[in-house]
Regions:
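N-terminal polyanion-binding entry modules of DNA glycosylases/AP lyases
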Residues: 1-119
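Catalytic DNA-binding helix-loop module of base-excision-repair DNA glycosylases/AP lyases
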Residues: 50, 119-130
Length: 130
């Protein structure tokens, strides 16, 4: 994994959180807090979709099960997975649909990932949910 430049709000957010909570400030100051990337947008988007709107514990559990059934996280491996396997890891019908659509977009190279990385969060979301 490689270090990436933090978003524009990163340092301000760390200062804000440190002022609000002394215990959290101690933790923030103990670590350099750099961000890392796997440099794999497909992996990152899968992880984001699986973790949406559920607790961290549930997301981690679903993710570990997902990794186990897919073995290597690639668009073609996701496309090949049966719906039953995806349900067995705890994914909802809607998440399965989103993951499959995204996998097909990546597989057929219809998703401009380089352009996506340059977009604001809002523009990236609009592009992904079109």
């Amino acid at each position: 994994m490689k270090k990436i430049k933090p978003p524009h709000y990163w340092h301000e957010a760390k200062k804000f959180l440190s002022k609000k909570d002394k215990k959290l400030a101690k933790i923030i100051n103990q670590y350099d807090g750099h961000l890392v990337t796997r440099n794999d947008p497909f992996y990152s988007l899968c992880r984001s979709i699986i973790g949406q709107q559920i607790s961290v514990k549930a997301a981690d559990s679903a993710w570990l099960k997902f990794e186990k059934v897919i073995k290597k996280i690639t668009p073609i491996n996701l496309i090949k997975l049966s719906r039953a396997k995806l349900v067995s890891v705890g994914l909802s019908r809607q998440k399965i649909l989103y993951l499959r659509i995204m996998a097909k977009e990546f597989f057929h190279k219809r998703l401009d990932v380089k352009n996506l990385q340059k977009m604001s969060d809002e523009d990236a979301i609009k592009h992904l949910v079109r």
